């Protein structure tokens, strides 16, 4: 089995999907989890205005709507959390995503004060954060806020991780990667677009250039620039297609060096790192 085949198998990626079937699969997955653990009353998700959180948010709200109707349990809710760092450049996209999702509840937590306070505390301890590490601080502060909200609403935190993100480890460890449940896991980027198209999402929310937008020195840096490959390249690779040798090397290098991000903390029983 080639490394490409191993990666595809590990991430559960498929070369083709039926959008309606995958929508149903994600909704039923969320509903089943909530029904298995009836003490869970809320799904909590950060909404950025980008493709992934818009899709995950829509699926969460659809799952909650169906479950309330089927069970009569009105205590169930989907909580969308806006977490800007100061003023977000694409705030209108966030509002458009909220309008599309129609969440039961919307909370706004501006993380800038908390991030700056943490940075100052570290500075006083003799640690000066780089811009890149400050970006990770933002991602972790957002996750901290979501877990606090989930803790106060008997909820779980929903993630937006998918195959095209998992393969490159393009997420912050214990930041946006530290979630309870990931309904998009298995899909690549273009397949996510297919689901949003089927759901009637406004095109500008999934046709814009994806960005983590974590770095102050490089605001709105496109993911594809940071990664050195395009999402079309990544999706082709995940679909088992032949890609240029340099593209394959870049993708596989990202996959191998970020393996620790896709695993629990390493223990004496692990040996995947002995390479």
Curated annotation (Swiss-Prot):
Q: Where does deamido-NAD(+) bind?
A: 140, 173, 180, 260-261
Q: Which SUPFAM superfamilies match?
A: Adenine nucleotide alpha hydrolases-like (SSF52402)
User: Disulfide pairs?
Assistant: none
Q: Which UniProt keywords apply?
A: ATP-binding, Ligase, Magnesium, Metal-binding, NAD, Nucleotide-binding
Gene3D superfamilies cross-referenced by the UniProt entry: HUPs
**Which parts form a coiled-coil structure per UniProt?**
none
What InterPro entries does the entry give?
NAD/GMP_synthase (IPR022310), NAD_synthase (IPR003694), NH(3)-dep_NAD(+)_synth (IPR022926), Rossmann-like_a/b/a_fold (IPR014729)
Recorded superkingdom: Bacteria
Q: Could you name the Gene Ontology cellular component terms for this entry?
A: cytoplasm
- Could you say which residues bind ATP here? 46-53, 160, 189, 211
**At which positions is Mg(2+) bound?**
52, 165
Under which pathway is this protein filed?
Answer: Cofactor biosynthesis; NAD(+) biosynthesis; NAD(+) from deamido-NAD(+) (ammonia route): step 1/1
Indicate the family of this protein: Belongs to the NAD synthetase family.
Quaternary structure annotation from Swiss-Prot or TrEMBL: Homodimer.
Summarizing the function annotation, the protein's role is: Catalyzes the ATP-dependent amidation of deamido-NAD to form NAD. Uses ammonia as a nitrogen source.
Tell me the protein's name. NH(3)-dependent NAD(+) synthetase
Report the source organism.
Answer: Escherichia coli O8 (strain IAI1)
Gene this chain is encoded by? nadE
